[in-house]
Amino acid sequence: MSVLKKPDLTDPKLRAKLAKGMGHNYYGEPAWPNDLLYIFPVVILGTLACVIGLSVLAPSPIGEKADPFATPLEILPEWYFFPTFNLLRVIPNKLLGVLSMAAVPVGLITVPFIESVNKFQNPFRRPVAMTVFVFSVVFAIWLGIGATMPINKALTLGLF
């Protein structure tokens, strides 16, 4: 049921485009009706069947009932907020804590202006960007691990 459009290789315009490495829109299998009517619905229905099947076969547990009068011993944020939570917890001045969190996007915005090389180059040829990236990832992991510890070990992780 698919429609196949064959190229007219005697057409001089098409031959000129093919010589330049272009012309892929003039031949081959068109998206309508082949992809849009036959392939996409199969993929969408297959994905829907997988999601419904998994939710029926392995439902997620509800857990224990919430008690509004029982406060947990330690309230921690989700794991992706651990570095910022630890930063706010460790810095005594809250204004400095908020400004240090605002310094992260400002620092990321300044990296392209500090290092003005071709953005399509190998990342290992961009030493400033790679140094900032590696340092910030290590620092975020360090702060994230420290957020799970008591406040007196939050920065040193109990190593020093």
UniProtKB/Swiss-Prot annotation:
The lineage of its organism: Eukaryota, Cryptophyceae, Pyrenomonadales, Geminigeraceae, Guillardia. PROSITE patterns: CYTB_CTER (PS51003). One of its GO terms (molecular function) is electron transporter, transferring electrons within the cyclic electron transport pathway of photosynthesis activity. This is Cytochrome b6-f complex subunit 4. One of its GO terms (cellular component) is chloroplast thylakoid membrane. The 4 large subunits of the cytochrome b6-f complex are cytochrome b6, subunit IV (17 kDa polypeptide, petD), cytochrome f and the Rieske protein, while the 4 small subunits are petG, petL, petM and petN. The complex functions as a dimer. Belongs to the cytochrome b family. PetD subfamily. It is found in: Plastid, Chloroplast thylakoid membrane. InterPro entries: Cyt_b/b6_C (IPR005798), Cyt_b/b6_C_sf (IPR036150), Cyt_b6/f_cplx_suIV (IPR005870), Cytochrome_b_C_euk/bac (IPR048260). It is a multi-pass membrane protein. Component of the cytochrome b6-f complex, which mediates electron transfer between photosystem II (PSII) and photosystem I (PSI), cyclic electron flow around PSI, and state transitions. Disulfide bonds: none annotated. Its main location: plastid. Gene3D superfamilies: plastocyanin oxidoreductase, Single helix bin. The gene is petD. The chain crosses the membrane at residues 36-56, 95-115, 127-147. GO terms for biological process: photosynthetic electron transport chain. Keywords: Chloroplast, Electron transport, Membrane, Photosynthesis, Plastid, Thylakoid, Transmembrane, Transmembrane helix, Transport. Pfam families: Cytochrom_B_C.
